[in-house]
């Protein structure tokens, strides 16, 4: 499988320009559209390329998926128990406390406030991640990616809960 950054003609950095990503993606989709194929073999090849382009685009477009993918390129698998255990007990405790807070909150306004807090935390974590990858500090990038994953989980839980409160 080709490196997603290479496939889309992008520099392999975390802090990518999403507008350039989108521009490259659409240009490549047009170039390799199966309907433009001259024969069946080329059509099948274009289908595979188009599928890979979709995977690459949706992976690189998302800050968490992009971080996980970059770590994977460096040989770090977040599903490894040793890697996941890099978060401190305090950080994990805070995460579970926040999950419980969300579960026990029934006011839409309160949920919105919590969501705003976590959206700010998400932005900050993405900025920290960009720095970690820039310095090639994989240990720190791994921790920051794990934190970002927990923040995404909390935001997802918040959105579910907010739908129920409407």
Curated annotation (Swiss-Prot):
Residues 3-73 form the J domain. Keywords: Chaperone. One of its GO terms (molecular function) is protein-folding chaperone binding. GO terms for biological process: [2Fe-2S] cluster assembly; protein complex oligomerization; protein folding. Signal peptide: none annotated. Belongs to the HscB family. NCBIfam families: hscB (TIGR00714). Co-chaperone involved in the maturation of iron-sulfur cluster-containing proteins. Seems to help targeting proteins to be folded toward HscA. Interacts with HscA and stimulates its ATPase activity. This is Co-chaperone protein HscB homolog. It comes from Rickettsia bellii (strain RML369-C).
